[in-house]
Amino acid sequence: MDPNCSCTAGGSCACPGSCKCKECKCTSCKKSCCSCCPVGCAKCAQGCICKGASDKCSCCA
């Protein structure tokens, strides 16, 4: 698994929760690259943690 999660710039993240992205360029989650974050979540860049298999994360819930 690529630790940097090379997401397409401006695209949506599809990285697993176990992936610690360092260079994710997704607009939805710039830092943590959480797949559970909705598009347009302004708090994702602060670092979010996906809650299990749910579609919510700690910063966007």
Swiss-Prot record:
Keyword annotations: Acetylation, Metal-binding, Metal-thiolate cluster, Phosphoprotein, Zinc
Binding residues annotated for a divalent metal cation 5, in chain numbering: C34, C36, C37, C50
Sequence positions that bind a divalent metal cation 4: C33, C34, C44, C48
Binding positions (a divalent metal cation 7): C50, C57, C59, C60
Pfam families reported for this sequence: Metallothio
Keyword Zinc-finger (UniProt): no
Organism: Stenella coeruleoalba (Striped dolphin)
GO biological process: cellular response to cadmium ion; cellular response to copper ion; cellular response to zinc ion; detoxification of copper ion; intracellular zinc ion homeostasis; negative regulation of growth
Sites where the protein binds a divalent metal cation 1: C5, C7, C21, C24
Gene name of this polypeptide: MT2
Function of the protein: Metallothioneins have a high content of cysteine residues that bind various heavy metals; these proteins are transcriptionally regulated by both heavy metals and glucocorticoids.
Residues that bind a divalent metal cation 2: C7, C13, C15, C26
Region of interest (Beta), residue spans: 1-29
Residues modified to Phosphoserine: S58
Annotated a divalent metal cation 6 binding sites: C37, C41, C44, C60
Similarity comment: Belongs to the metallothionein superfamily. Type 1 family.
Molecular-function GO terms, alphabetical: zinc ion binding
Binding site for a divalent metal cation 3: C15, C19, C24, C29
Region (Alpha): 30-61
Record protein name field: Metallothionein-2
One Gene Ontology cellular component annotation held by this UniProt entry: cytoplasm
SUPFAM superfamilies, per database record: Metallothionein
